[in-house]
């Protein structure tokens, strides 16, 4: 099992800080770095939700040019917000910049107020997500390619450059069973958030059962969990966060991370919940020097 990081999206962490954190993560042996996606944060959400969201494709391009081996990924691109043909072009170009290190996690989105600001139908987001995944794969893998859908159709078009990877991985975000179904039906992996190891074990049993029903081979299917982390001097019981979060004293956090190892998942991606860059670097060094060698 590997450890990855999500780029911090908290106040006081700017894009240059994010770049430095990604470079440090690679130096310390972390295997992946992920960029989140929101375009606007409506006023009613400000204060309850971070509004520091650089464009994921631009920040990942910068990271790709300052690192050599760490995997990079979107987590998760909200597909209905963008023209999927343009997303396909951005991803394929980025895959060249990073020499084939890209994974594209996608999701249908959840913040209705953001859909409203962008003048995009909230109700149609699931159907669009499914169709847009098909558009991405059609453009990346076939040439010339034809596609006929409810939202996009094209005939005999050429799309270049193709990604470096012959099969650029598309993972599905989301915690609900419907998200699991979409990941099995249309994607190459599943990336939920915030589950404890016991909760994730239950979800994985459902995933395997559904995959068996659909006769989906899971040999090349990846599972990656995102969870919040902060190492403090206080017990996790006093953190004020849900008990599923990786928050508390160092030994408590380490034990929680190690508990996922029995599930045979690809990685745990760490979401830092402190706005202090130095604390984030200190935590990276602690994990890189003490926990990653054990994994």
Where are these regions (language model features)?
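N-terminal beta1-alpha1-beta2 module of alpha/beta enzyme domains
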Residues: 1-66, 168, 273, 278, ...
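Hydrophobic faces of well-ordered beta-strands that scaffold small-molecule active sites
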Residues: 3-7, 33-35, 72-74, 102-106, ...
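Active-site mouth loops of central-metabolism enzymes
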Residues: 4-15, 75-85, 165-175, 237-251
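Active-site beta-loop-alpha junctions enriched in small/polar residues
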Residues: 8-10, 38-40, 77-79, 107-111, ...
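Short, acidic/polar
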Residues: 13-25, 90, 172-182, 246-260
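Acidic (Asp/Glu)-rich catalytic clusters
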Residues: 26-27, 60-68, 91, 95-101, ...
């Amino acid at each position: 099992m590997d450890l990855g990081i999500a780029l911090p999206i908290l106040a006081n962490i700017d894009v240059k800080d994010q770049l430095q954190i990604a470079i440090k993560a690679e130096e310390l042996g972390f295997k992946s770095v992920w960029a989140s996606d929101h375009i606007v944060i409506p006023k009613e959400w400000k204060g309850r939700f971070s509004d520091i969201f650089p464009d994921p494709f631009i920040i990942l391009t910068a990271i790709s040019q300052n690192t050599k081996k760490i995997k990079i990924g979107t987590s998760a691109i909200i597909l209905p917000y963008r023209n999927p043909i343009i997303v396909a072009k951005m991803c394929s170009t980025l895959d060249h910049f990073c020499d084939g290190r890209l994974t594209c996690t996608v999701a249908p989105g959840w913040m209705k107020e953001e859909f409203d600001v962008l003048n995009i139908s909230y109700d149609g987001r699931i159907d669009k997500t499914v169709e847009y995944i098909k558009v991405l794969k059609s453009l990346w893998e076939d040439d010339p390619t034809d596609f006929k859908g409810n939202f996009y159709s094209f005939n005999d078009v050429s799309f270049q450059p193709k990604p470096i990877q012959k099969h650029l991985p598309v993972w599905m975000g989301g915690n609900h069973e419907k998200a699991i179904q979409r990941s099995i039906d249309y994607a190459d992996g599943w990336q939920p958030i915030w589950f404890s190891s016991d909760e994730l074990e239950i979800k994985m049993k459902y995933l395997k059962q559904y995959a068996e029903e659909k006769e989906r081979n899971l040999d090349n299917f990846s599972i990656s969990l995102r969870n919040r982390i902060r190492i403090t001097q206080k017990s996790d019981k006093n953190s004020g966060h849900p008990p599923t979060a990786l928050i508390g004293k160092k030994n408590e956090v380490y034990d929680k991370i190690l508990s996922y190892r029995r599930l045979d998942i690809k990685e745990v991606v760490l979401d830092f919940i402190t706005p202090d860059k130095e604390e984030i670097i200190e935590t990276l060094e602690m994990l890189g020097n003490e926990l990653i060698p054990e994994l």
